[in-house]
Amino acid sequence: MTSNVRTKMATSVLQPESRREHEPKAEIPESPRLTDDERMAILEAKERETGELPAELRERARIEMREEPAIREHALAQMRHFIEKHPAIKKSRTDAPFLLRFLRTKKYSVPQACAMLERYLSLRQVHPHWFQKLDPLDPKIAAVIDAGYLVPLPKRDAEGRRVVLSCMGRFDPYVYDSCVMARVHSMIVELLLDEPRSQLLGYTHVNDEAGMQMPHVSLWSFNDVRTMLNCIQNSTPMRHKCTHFVNVPHYGAKFFEFAVSLLSDKLKDRVMFHRNTQDLNKHVDPAILPKEYGGTVPLRDMIEELKRKLLKHREELLALDEMCVDVNALEKNDITQDVHSTAGSFRKLELD
């Protein structure tokens, strides 16, 4: 075989490969990058499972509520012992995220945290029409959620607090009663209470009363308002940092004045009334609010995200009804004194 033939054959064999080297290569599609909001949602979901605060908030927790690893573990052990030995508590959650609700609210005063746990379990037993059967698939509850009456906003405020928006005009008082309203609130609260960031930083409430009618006011008796506010203030492990009311009609003003008069002085100082949304936006960044209030994300999108979260945690919400306490036995119980008697060793641990 001549050298010319060999060269020709080699060229014919190599040419296709050579051509492929110069052809544009097919790009491998990249997995979609997460937005900052999506990344934060994943982080918060992991924190919720463990009860652990993110690194950037641990120093603040140490300063504000004396939280350190040794103190936290000792306090959790004390609360679990309290529950185990309590003659009136038949069943209760004992996981860290649940118990940390009470410890962080009471800044690691174990006796106060245990006392609040007693009250919390008791109120669920005494007022089941308000605090039990928190099922997102219940037709009435699902309809109220879908209407957008109560929505925790995806983004936190400037202080890092979870913001809960209520829109009274989206609750139909001709179809639903105060029990449905209370159960919707209880369900949303339970969904949020296990968030470590919120246990430390607290909550901001924005209540838009536009569309409020007299039937809304008549849903609640003065007695029920008094009882509910007592439950919220003294039995719910939730740090209420700021409450905004906006667009309150003249016939609703007296109702809210009465309600605010029942609050502790500390909570009274955290209530603000605004004439309109523009005034509200001076205190709450409109960027975190729904598009209808000056933000960028439509309220409908926020509602759909809430519905997904509620379904994800539905079993947890329903399992709350398995907790049980003998309310009558609570009055005869003196085990809280045992917690007080061990508080000295807890304080010693704080100082060591």
Regions found by a protein language model. Give the residues of each.
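Basic, amphipathic alpha-helical/coil surface patches used to engage anionic, phosphate-bearing ligands
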Residues: 1-352
